[in-house]
From Swiss-Prot:
Gene: der1
Residue span(s) of domain KH-like: 368-452
Organism (species): Alteromonas mediterranea (strain DSM 17117 / CIP 110805 / LMG 28347 / Deep ecotype)
Database matches in PROSITE patterns: G_ENGA
GO BP terms: ribosome biogenesis
Quaternary structure (record): Associates with the 50S ribosomal subunit.
Gene3D superfamilies: 3.30.300.20, P-loop containing nucleotide triphosphate hydrolases
Keyword field: GTP-binding, Nucleotide-binding, Repeat, Ribosome biogenesis
Family: Belongs to the TRAFAC class TrmE-Era-EngA-EngB-Septin-like GTPase superfamily. EngA (Der) GTPase family.
Matches recorded under HAMAP family: GTPase_Der
Protein name in the entry: GTPase Der
Length: 481
């Protein structure tokens, strides 16, 4: 599980600027997945060899009404679920009543909090930040998010205390030649239960589907402190295969006796996706493909998880409406053509039984053993069918390929100038490998490594005989001139 860092503060203090810097994003597009939008408030961030989830909670002033009040409530929920809170204030504007109001709320929660004075570029940061000590939340960290000043030190201080509680936070670099590590990883995955996360936006029928799969009312309504943080982990067995169901809808808040409203948490959903081997994304057929569905798909793809899509509430729809929905899915979900899509009714059970065939297929594809000889052969076939382009007048040469990891499958290609391959050719290779290996239900990651020249940096030392020959040749050419 990855830790969660929440960015908190009133409007216009620079939360979005810091968010973009941490997640390396500037717009709503996800690289290499045309047509997919990214939620600007939630993202995956990497700092040095650590990764974490960052949440931009939006501006909170304390006097919100209507829909703004609902958004503020979601922000407060994100704060409750965070492991570290970065409380941003504007060093140029000074301490305002809204800052004091947010500080009053933060004092009541038991979280690690850092007060971050932003926009200190071009001013005396120490003197301008001094008044924020009156908030009573400890030392003040000074940054200029727009230019990156002070951000590295801030992250060092914020993430260091979390290392013992979140061992998954560390990114482990696998050496390309260590294929044994990839194979041992594959064997471990084969022996463990399949972790299946059921995710989707509120009220699409996640709990109904979970109960239908389990055959009993297991996902109950909780009303206890502490249950808002964790997803529900349910062990089960199907077709002689062990599973762990990660249910993100297991925690709900009862408003009325007859009405249970899901307490939706994107943070909890992101953590479930990171934890899972296969993600079952539930979409409401009656609402079509929404931006929130696309955001969740973006998180799944960025995490490299296997994917199965279940379009729920399919029963009762007319043939014309069903055809319209299928056309919309073809148009908007073309970038996940590797994933199986099922049309189901969780309430009545139709189509639910077929889901696990696709879940197993996706997991087997993600953990399939692929040897170096086969991968290199497929790479050479792809190279023969469609030659790599010229780069600076030279043809890119791919030499060999091997497995670099599993879940998702990682293919490492070595060669000359491979880093300069255009994205279109990389997509061609990805599709070629997928078709040749019959991989379904999981994304493929291809890494490119430049071939090292063994003579690079070495001086050519001539023997005495070679030196005499070289002198004779040089004198010969001089005489000819």
């Amino acid at each position: 599980m990855l830790p969660v860092v929440a960015l908190v503060g009133r409007p216009n203090v620079g939360k979005s600027t810091l968010f973009n810097r941490l997640t390396n994003t500037r717009d709503a597009l996800v690289a290499d997945y045309p047509g997919l939008t990214r939620d600007r408030k939630y993202g995956q961030a990497k700092f040095e060899k650590r990764q974490f989830i960052v949440v931009d909670t939006g501006g909170i002033t304390g006097d919100e009404e209507g829909i703004d009040a609902e958004m503020a409530q979601q922000s407060l929920l994100a704060i409750e679920e965070a492991d570290v809170v970065l409380f941003l204030v504007d060093a140029r504007a000074g301490l305002l009543p809204a800052d004091q109001g947010i500080a009053d709320h933060l004092r009541r929660i038991n979280k690690q909090i850092f007060v971050v004075a932003n926009k200190v570029d071009g001013i005396d940061g120490d003197s301008e930040s001094a008044e924020f000590y009156s908030l009573g939340l400890g030392a003040i960290k000074q940054i200029a998010a727009a230019h990156g000043r002070g951000v590295s030190q801030l992250l060092q201080d914020a993430l260091k205390p979390l290392e013992s509680d979140f061992p998954d936070m560390e990114i482990i670099d696998e050496a390309p030649e260590e294929e044994e590590d990839a194979e041992s990883q594959r064997q471990r995955l084969q022996e463990l239960p399949i972790k299946l996360a059921i995710v989707g936006k509120p009220n699409v029928g996640k709990s109904t589907l979970t109960n239908r799969i389990l055959g009993e009312e297991r996902v109950v309504v909780y009303d206890m402190p502490g249950t808002t943080r964790d997803s529900v982990y349910i062990p089960m067995e199907r077709d002689e295969r062990e599973y762990i169901l990660i249910d993100t809808a297991g925690v709900r808040k009862r408003k009325k006796i007859s009405e249970a409203v899901e307490k939706f948490s994107i943070v909890k959903t992101l953590q479930a996706i990171e934890e899972a081997n296969v993600v079952l994304l539930v979409i409401d057929a009656r609402e079509g493909i929404t931006d929130q569905d696309l955001s969740l798909l973006g998180f799944v793809l960025n995490s490299g998880r296997s994917l199965v899509v279940a379009v729920n509430k399919w029963d009762g729809l007319s043939t014309d409406i069903k055809d319209d929905i299928k056309r919309e899915m073809d148009r908007r979900l073309g970038f996940i053509d590797f994933a199986r899509i099922h049309f189901i009714s969780a309430l009545h059970g139709s189509g639910v039984g077929n889901l696990f065939e696709s879940v197993q297929e996706a997991y087997m594809s993600a953990t399939k053993r692929i040897n170096t000889a086969l991968l290199t052969q497929i790479m050479e076939m792809a190279q023969d069918d469609h030659q790599p382009p010229l780069v600076r007048g030279r043809r890119v040469k791919m030499k060999y390929a091997h497995a670099g990891g599993y879940n998702p499958p990682v293919i490492v290609i070595h060669g000359n100038q491979v880093d300069d391959l255009p994205s279109s050719y990389k997509r061609f290779l990805m599709n070629y490998f997928r078709k040749a290996l019959e991989i379904m239900g999981t994304p493929i990651k291809i890494e490119f490594r430049e071939g090292n020249n063994p003579f690079e940096g070495k001086k050519n030392n001539l023997t005495l005989a070679q030196q005499r020959k070289r002198r004779r040749m040089m004198s010969y050419y001089k005489e000819k001139k």
